[in-house]
Amino acid sequence: MKRITKENYENIVYISHEFQNNPENVIEIETIIKKLQKEYPTYLFISPVHTFGYLYDDVSYEQGLNMTLFLLDTCCDEMWYVPSETSRGVSAEITYCQKFDIPCKPIEM
């Protein structure tokens, strides 16, 4: 078995989507990533909702946001987001990308 590193993927993309502890949002994220994975088979898509969503009621909002921003900053090449006028998290992630020159763009579905 060989070691798997970032070089194994053409791009590592953080998927930003509103969560608000809503199971329907989880299903929508899964649908989006499945479609994107077929369109971009050499990319790795990372969902912070699937990584940290189970902690929604166990950590503060700020702590949860910091965890997701750390994941974004350390693991991913860029962020793609589903535009949302109601999600503080998506807005914070976009602001973070702009401040630290992390490429980000809306997902066009």
PLM segments and residue spans:
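Conserved catalytic or regulatory cores that recognize and/or transform ribose-phosphate-containing ligands
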Residues: 1-109
